[in-house]
Amino acid sequence: MAVTVETLEKLERKITLSLPLTTIQTEVDARLKRLARTVKMDGFRPGKVPMSVVAQRYGYSVQYEVLNDKVGEAFAQAANEANLRVAGQPRITEKDGAPEGEVTFDAVFEVFPEVKIGDLSTAEVEKLSAEVTDSAIDKTVDILRKQRRTFAQRALAAAAEDGDRVTVDFEGKIDGEPFQGGKAEDFQFLVGEGQMLKEFEDAVRGMKSGESKTFPLAFPEDYHGKDVAGKTADFMVTVKKIEAAHLPEVNEQLAKSLGIADGTVEGLRADIKKNLEREVKFRLLARNKQAVMDALVSKAELDLPNASVQAEIARLLEAARADLKQRGIKDADKAEIPEDVFRPQAERRVRLGLVVAELVRANNLQAKPEQLKAHVDELAASYEKPEDVVRWYFSDRNRLAEVEAVVIENNVTDFVLGQAKVNDKAVSFDELMGQA
């Protein structure tokens, strides 16, 4: 097979492939013979259809398949011999004027770029740190108590206040007409916890059992119910019951109910601290990893293969449609979503992927078996039966590949932090958790 390689521009290349017609015809004949042994046609016994009839019926499609296969094989062989790392699928077209006895094709494609990573010692990375405080443990204890609270009916003269559970009947109308989801009986919610729109909670707060009132409520423009979003409804609400919340005491009984082995408050707080420290570690790793990747990309020079960018745009577009479909949007598969919306994100993902791959290759940062095991053990530690979770990960190659990708990212993060100028910054627990 004769091969020529031509550089068009930047990452674009062209290979000219020449194939002997005899090679193609030999394969076509072989496939038609195999087909003749199994093909069924009216008027002939199975396996007894004449070759001329088989060729007349199936010759064109078989020749098309053979050409595709042979050109694909020739392209792969040529790219391999030329040490080309092909990005995406080639555009293959047949050329006119081929030498006698040959068929010639042009394959135009992109190659992956050379990645140049600058001096990482001049990169600056802000590295966050945070600690689990007693206050954070106290807040978690309060959350656990709320999850186990009980309710007791309050006196009829008592007014609803934050923390109470109220049972109400309500009906809303827009321009005098009822709307879907605007009416309910014996509906319960907790006042002051954001389960209802603020105007609704404000109206109920201070009401007593047996009282009714009407009030206007403006639905936000971004309200999930599109039929009422941005509109104002008139609501009638009747309070039927008000119940006060009672939180369990922080004692041995609470600790035991939460599965604490020694059944002590100290053991409960220690267990909470351990879990929060694990969460803090993962949050810090994610934030610091993002800072490292930003610094790494800023120090890299490379051209982006358009084929890779377009493939990433297609993935993001598919994910966006799936999200719309999950939200109940009609005809999500047909929704017009401009590709350019995803281009910046796609370009960053492709750029980051290529830079990370080069750093891993150049510095042997691949995931080691002991690192995979340690990471899986850490993921499994928070489960009731960690050994089952470990087996679950190692029993599936795809799941293990996801773990491997995370470990490689961690290796890259550690490597860059060891090279770059690191600015340490302590943040509060609440700030890290997005609660500040």
UniProtKB/Swiss-Prot annotation:
<dbReference type="GO" id="GO:0061077">
    <property type="term" value="P:chaperone-mediated protein folding"/>
</dbReference>
<dbReference type="Pfam" id="PF05698">
    <property type="entry name" value="Trigger_C"/>
</dbReference>
<dbReference type="GO" id="GO:0015031">
    <property type="term" value="P:protein transport"/>
</dbReference>
<protein>
    <recommendedName>
        <fullName>Trigger factor</fullName>
        <ecNumber>5.2.1.8</ecNumber>
    </recommendedName>
</protein>
<keyword id="KW-0413">Isomerase</keyword>
<dbReference type="GO" id="GO:0005737">
    <property type="term" value="C:cytoplasm"/>
</dbReference>
<comment type="similarity">
    <text>Belongs to the FKBP-type PPIase family. Tig subfamily.</text>
</comment>
<feature type="domain" description="PPIase FKBP-type">
    <location>
        <begin position="163"/>
        <end position="248"/>
    </location>
</feature>
<dbReference type="GO" id="GO:0043335">
    <property type="term" value="P:protein unfolding"/>
</dbReference>
<dbReference type="Pfam" id="PF00254">
    <property type="entry name" value="FKBP_C"/>
</dbReference>
<comment type="function">
    <text>Involved in protein export. Acts as a chaperone by maintaining the newly synthesized protein in an open conformation. Functions as a peptidyl-prolyl cis-trans isomerase.</text>
</comment>
<keyword id="KW-0963">Cytoplasm</keyword>
<dbReference type="InterPro" id="IPR036611">
    <property type="entry name" value="Trigger_fac_ribosome-bd_sf"/>
</dbReference>
<dbReference type="InterPro" id="IPR008881">
    <property type="entry name" value="Trigger_fac_ribosome-bd_bac"/>
</dbReference>
<dbReference type="GO" id="GO:0051083">
    <property type="term" value="P:'de novo' cotranslational protein folding"/>
</dbReference>
<dbReference type="InterPro" id="IPR005215">
    <property type="entry name" value="Trig_fac"/>
</dbReference>
<keyword id="KW-0132">Cell division</keyword>
<dbReference type="GO" id="GO:0051301">
    <property type="term" value="P:cell division"/>
</dbReference>
<dbReference type="InterPro" id="IPR001179">
    <property type="entry name" value="PPIase_FKBP_dom"/>
</dbReference>
<dbReference type="InterPro" id="IPR027304">
    <property type="entry name" value="Trigger_fact/SurA_dom_sf"/>
</dbReference>
<dbReference type="GO" id="GO:0003755">
    <property type="term" value="F:peptidyl-prolyl cis-trans isomerase activity"/>
</dbReference>
<dbReference type="InterPro" id="IPR008880">
    <property type="entry name" value="Trigger_fac_C"/>
</dbReference>
<dbReference type="InterPro" id="IPR037041">
    <property type="entry name" value="Trigger_fac_C_sf"/>
</dbReference>
<keyword id="KW-0143">Chaperone</keyword>
<dbReference type="Pfam" id="PF05697">
    <property type="entry name" value="Trigger_N"/>
</dbReference>
<dbReference type="InterPro" id="IPR046357">
    <property type="entry name" value="PPIase_dom_sf"/>
</dbReference>
<dbReference type="GO" id="GO:0043022">
    <property type="term" value="F:ribosome binding"/>
</dbReference>
<keyword id="KW-0697">Rotamase</keyword>
<keyword id="KW-0131">Cell cycle</keyword>
<dbReference type="GO" id="GO:0044183">
    <property type="term" value="F:protein folding chaperone"/>
</dbReference>
